[in-house]
Amino acid sequence: SRGLGDVYKRQCHNYDAMDHAKQHPEAARQMKVAAKDNQSCIDCHKGIAHQLPDMSSGFRKQFDELRASANGSGDTLYSIDIKPIYAAKGDKEASGSLLPASEVKVLKRDGDWLQIEITGWTESAGRQRVLTQFPGKRIFVASIRGDVQQQVKTLEKTTVADTDTEWSKLQATAWMKKGDMVNDIKPIWAYADSLYNGTCNQCHGAPEISHFDANGWIGTLNGMIGFTSLDKREERTLLKYLQMNASDTAGKAHGDKKEEK
């Protein structure tokens, strides 16, 4: 409960005593909003806000085990790392990247190569180089360029009411090398949960994931990432996990067809 624990926290962390100029810009922004609404510390920071042991060895061992047990069989696969994608089998220069925890359909297997199909959303009026999980939400699936981008198919379009912008659902075909792909998303989310609890508990109690929406998690995590030792892959995986379980996406399955109109 927030009662007694929050009383103890506010003895040390009184809003009036805070010097926002000495805080990280994102932390200062969040604290100003919390102070205005007189939010409880535990609304964002559950648990004890004291230094906890470094848990990085635990989640890094978990990733090594995930990579070692990776099963790339099946028609639907999920990435565990940032993977380059190519316009043609054997190309030396990449035509984009597949981001962690992203779904692909396998069209063909040829030696060490897979031909894949990637589906995602992009702003119709934009450069259409980034595919996202849902329209209007910056949950990144892949970046595309060159021949991969030139040969995309448009499946449907929708208008996001909040911003009155049109988004297009695109389908891209590309090639990638085998490896670092699994046929079940659940082990990736289990690893990402360990990332979250092992990293975000180092400075404070990890906030409830549903406290922020998918786009809000980008700025929130950026404000904290400088205090961690996460590499780019870990950061991307963690962000995807938080966004897929945010206040406006929680419960949506990977590849859910019921995108918000």
Name each model feature, range by range.
Residues 3-8:
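Short, small-residue-biased leader/transition segments that mark boundaries at the very start
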Residues 101, 113-120:
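SH3/SH3-like beta-barrel fold
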Residues 54-89, 96-99, 107-110, 129, ...:
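SH3-family beta-barrel domains
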Residues 182-231:
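Conserved, compact domain cores that house catalytic/ligand-binding motifs in diverse enzymes
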Residues 1-2, 25-32, 183-191:
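Short, intrinsically disordered, charge-biased short linear motifs at domain edges
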